[in-house]
Amino acid sequence: MAADGGMFESSRSIEEKRESKRRARQELLSKAKDDYSKAEKRKEQQRLRGEDTWMLDDVNDRLEALNQEHSAKNKKKKEKHRHKLKKEKKKKSKKQKSERNDDSEDSSSDSEEEWVEAPPLQAASEKKAWKIKAEVKAEVPEKSTERDEWMTLDFMSLKATSAAAMRAEKQKEKTLEHEKAQAAETEKLLSRELNPYWKDGGTGLPPKEGDVTSVKKLQHVEDGGLSWLRKSYQRMKEQSERENRSLDDIVAERYGSMEDFQRKLEAAEQAASQNSNDGQRERWKKSHSQDDEFRRYPRSSQHTDDNSRPRHTDHNRYNKYSHKESQEYKHSEESSRYRKEPEHRRQSFEDRNQDKSVSFKPKNPFLKPSDDDGRSLNIRDYKSLKNKVTGVQDSSKPCFQKPLSNEDEISWKKVPSKDCSEKKQQQSQDSEKPFFHKPSGSEGELSWKKIQPKYCSEKKQESQKEDSVSKERKGSREQTEPDAYSRESQSVKERPQSPRPDRSPQPIRILSDEEMNKLGAKIVKAELLGNMDLASKLRAQLEEARQQKERKSQGTSPVSERRSEAEESNLNKDNEVLLVRTDQSGRAWPVNAAADSMEPKGGRRKRQMVATHVDKERVRYFHDDDNQSLQDMVKREKMGTSEDQNKQFLRMASKFMEKTDRDYYTLDDMFVTKAAKKEHTDKEEERERMQAMHEHRSLTATMEKCRFCFDNAELPKHLIVAIGTKVYLCLPNHLSLTEGHCLIVPLQHHTASTLLDEDIYNEIQVFRKALVRMFESKGLDCVFLESNIYARKRLHLVYECIPLPKEVGDMAPIYFKKAIMESDEEWSMNKKLIDLSTKDIRRAVPKGLPYFSVDFGLQGGYAHVIEDEHKFPSYFGKEIIGGMLDLEPRIWRKAVRERFEDQRKKVLEFAQWWKPFDVTKE
């Protein structure tokens, strides 16, 4: 067994492994639960201690004052706006008054030039003025004595109505209006309803089997709404012709869009095909046993031993009606149905039956075949038999016959019932009429077959010839698939005027590169074999596929042009994002939008070489030198970084190392050749967009996790001591290096002092001077540290103030100078030590470079440009101070957490120190 190389394991060992996995999984789950419970317990304890709510009273007052100032500013803005509106209204009214006065002055300009004495008032009336006033006064009380109608109204006779009754009345009116609207809507729907079981108060379902009308009504049910949709499409088409409007607009009004209507039509066709498939399985099993010579089952090539077994019992079991009963039932049902139909319905039904090929024909489910249908073998035999039994019927009424069984072809046709002579004369028109075919078995096998009667053998041979002729005319359209869905789709394809709506062209499938390569291989193979016709066809197909791919890359596909435009407009409305990139100095500029490139995307293509020399003289180095102006080159140089140059260098060196081993081909030649190769026009823009998206995501994640941003919920409020307009003063959230260790932090997210605005930098200097005066009053010296190491991480700017004893503070410049000179790389590209005694950090260090700076009180200090960010420690300044004060390395190497009570004591003590020097209260 070992020689076979098989490794066997006992069930016990397998069970032990499973058990160990279960235990490990259980331990992990229990550990995760414990950690979660501990974290929740810690949060609850912090909440009970008041860590999330407690803060200094001065800080609380300051926050309230800031809120009041903000609200006062908003009120002032609102009042100012309101006052402005009032002024504008007054100005408008004054203008209108002045215009009116001007008009009146213009009209009475002549009268103003002369003074005319007014006639005396007594001339108008002989009565004195005082008498007129008295009369007016006397008339006023007479008018007041007349009472209004409501005063004389008897309120006790009025009908009292409560609020509940009024509400009930309103609700009743609303329900009545709703019922009226619903009734009107149902009337409209019933007028358009094509389902006969919904009309005249129907339930939508067919009646029981005992009802006579159930047989005919089955023609309009179980089709999934297909007939209704086709009729609706016909009406929409007629409406478009009548109103001279576009068909797409009318379809969009009713169904939303043509695509939605087509989707519903396809779903209805699938449902109808499934229903017809299920129904035909039961119907075609039924046969009729009036004459044994007409009832025999097929003989299969694989089951020849079963042919001798009688099948009379099977036939008798499915036989339900005799020939005469079936014909009488059909005539009585049709006559009663015809009498019940209204006049316009009867006329429309006759018109539809007279011209089925022109009008829309809903998919009728095939009813149970009668005895004469089962006895028929072809169209001619059916007519002769029917004339013997039932006499001559109306020739305009179509009939559906059960299909014939034939080794070569099985077909049954729907034709008008006419004489055999007329059938021969109209044989040339049979190919234009719809054919319904029953699928045959594979390789000529038939699942059922009927033996034709002796007196119809000659007619059957003639019909077979006619069927073969019609089959040749149909050509490749005839298919024999075994499912009902293919049968229905074939019948729809063969109709001369399909009721299917005029669909928009289906979206063409774009060939992939692999498929196009296979197509090219077929072209080569056809050319080698000498089949030039096939090669030309395949070549045209390949060219068309390439054009479609180019159209898709350009976004101008004619198939989905309208849909793509709508989707793009929706996307532009919903997701409009401005991508920006930030350079070393903190300036941001927008990234160019994506341009529609004419070059196809995907696949590996050889990059074309650009001519770099003309007459043995170099005219360009890079492929885009002709498109770059001096302004563009300066812009790219200022906005680019050293990382961009390194990435470009790596891209040029990555995929061109295969030729370096050849003679006379050096590394310089490789870069020169690589630079001269033409790149895709949109590659650089795509690269910039991806870089901008990456920067935006990283900045968003950094700002969400930042514990120093004033708007962040995780900011430790209990450590804040003072709040200014642009910066705030707080204590560290860990064990302090010395007593009085504090931080000056901007309110907003800023990364370095070299990128600060003027007002923020000035306020930091104000806090710095106040802290120096505070520590001087305590007999201490102080050192200010700032580390801007990881510029790409965009960390929050923190300006640390660490108090020192006087004797240690005097020696601090010597310690820091020596440490800076020995730090970082031995050979540096920038100056090792930068003196800040004569200029501040903003003028000493270029923007965007990582640096470390130290200031000693109000004096200047030193700065150092960091060469290697990975080798320079983030605790560099604290390490020097810890060495000067002989502190434990754990204090400055890794932040040591403190209890809330210790932090609160520390904050209260520092607040007492800070209170006399608080610059925020001035």
Curated annotation (Swiss-Prot):
Keyword flag Coiled coil: yes
Keywords carried by this UniProt record: Coiled coil
Biased composition (Basic residues): 73-95
Bias kind Acidic residues: ranges: 102-116
Feature: compositional bias, Basic and acidic residues: 12-52, 167-191, 288-355, 369-384, 410-435, 456-503, 540-553, 560-574
Coiled coil: 12-106, 165-278, 525-557, 673-706
Domain of life: Eukaryota
Pfam families hit by this protein: CwfJ_C_1, CwfJ_C_2
Disordered: annotated segments: 1-130, 164-220, 261-513, 540-574
PANTHER family: CWF19, CELL CYCLE CONTROL PROTEIN, CWF19-LIKE PROTEIN 2
Similarity comment: Belongs to the CWF19 family.
Name assigned to this protein: CWF19-like protein 2
Gene source species: Xenopus tropicalis
Lineage start: Eukaryota, Metazoa, Chordata, Craniata, Vertebrata
